[in-house]
From Swiss-Prot:
Gene: IAA19
Cellular component GO terms held in the UniProt record: nucleus
InterPro entries: AUX/IAA_dom, AUX_IAA, PB1-like
Tissue: Expressed in etiolated seedlings and flowers.
Domain PB1 as annotated: residue spans: 161-265
Function: Aux/IAA proteins are short-lived transcriptional factors that function as repressors of early auxin response genes at low auxin concentrations.
Biased composition (Low complexity): 114-126
Biased composition (Basic and acidic residues): 79-91
Family membership: Belongs to the Aux/IAA family.
Protein name: Auxin-responsive protein IAA19
Length: 281
């Protein structure tokens, strides 16, 4: 007779007594905590008892969440998010340190420049204040010395030369001569004849005065009518006079303009010596 059939648990529905006892022991604290959390208590709104806080902590630890992993404990490895947070914190700290260092350096530079400015001589009111003040002071000093040198050169040039304009009746242009380069009226007359040689023509053969004396011959008032051109000048008083009435040195200081005019137009003009002689008569 075959042996009786025994019921076998192939799926594992029936747990062993040891496993069931262990599972019951493991689930008992959680059930107790959950029951304590759900229990009704008397208290003010919003207040929490220590037992409820502990229960919430246990429930949170036992629950599964989809958020970021909690920070590592002990010697566990760091997560990706944690490493990023720490790197950003280090960068922020380094940036703050660099900013503080730059501010300190700027303060030290300003302090040093302020001490240099306090030790430097005070600039004049007319000088332009720049930065740094030492360079602007040197620039203003060089500009003042250059202006002074330029003024001295101009003064020397004005003292060393005496330029006057020369015009001629019928000539379409003007010339300018330096009276300091000539030593007498004769030299000036020759130079002007060379300048305006194309406009000055020979006089009539009846007049035998030399070519040199043609522009400056003012010794006789009657001779002006016979001369084709006569040299006149404008003095400081804006009066037109015949050349030759003053000594050469005095003439160079009083002459402002020269004009070679026709003898017929200068018939009413005479040197000052002849005018004074006529008044005395």
């Amino acid at each position: 007779m075959p042996p009786p059939l025994e019921a076998r648990d192939y799926i594992g529905l029936a747990a062993s007594p040891a496993s069931s006892s262990s599972s019951c022991c493991a689930s008992t604290p959680v059930a107790e905590v959950v029951g304590a959390h759900l229990a009704l208590r008397l208290g003010l709104p919003g207040s929490e008892s220590p037992a409820r806080a502990e229960a919430e902590a246990v429930v949170v630890d036992a629950a599964l969440t989809l958020g970021p992993a909690p920070p590592p404990r002990g010697g566990a490895k760091r997560g990706f998010v944690d490493s990023l947070d720490r790197s950003e914190g280090r960068r922020a700290a380094a940036t703050a340190g660099d900013d503080e260092r730059g501010v300190r350096e700027e303060e030290e530079e300003e302090k040093g420049l302020g001490e240099a400015a306090a030790g430097a001589p005070r600039a004049a009111k007319a000088q332009v204040v720049g930065w740094p003040p030492v360079r602007s002071y040197r620039k203003n000093t060089l500009a003042a010395s250059a202006t002074k040198t330029k003024g001295e050169d101009q003064g020397k040039s004005e003292v060393g030369c005496c330029y006057v304009k020369v015009s001629m009746d019928g000539a379409p242009y003007l010339r300018k001569v330096d009276l300091k380069t000539y030593s007498s009226y004769e030299d000036l007359s020759l130079a002007l004849e060379k300048m305006f040689s194309c406009f000055i023509t020979g006089r009539s053969s009846s007049h035998k005065t030399s070519k040199r004396d043609r522009l400056t011959d003012g010794s006789r008032a009657d001779a002006l009518k016979d001369q084709e051109y006569v040299l006149t000048y404008e003095d400081k008083d804006a009066d037109w006079m015949l050349v030759g009435d003053l000594p050469w040195d005095l003439f160079t200081t009083s002459c402002r303009k020269l004009r070679i005019m026709r003898g017929s137009d200068a018939a009413g003009m005479a040197p000052r010596s002849l005018e004074q002689t006529g008044q005395n008569k």
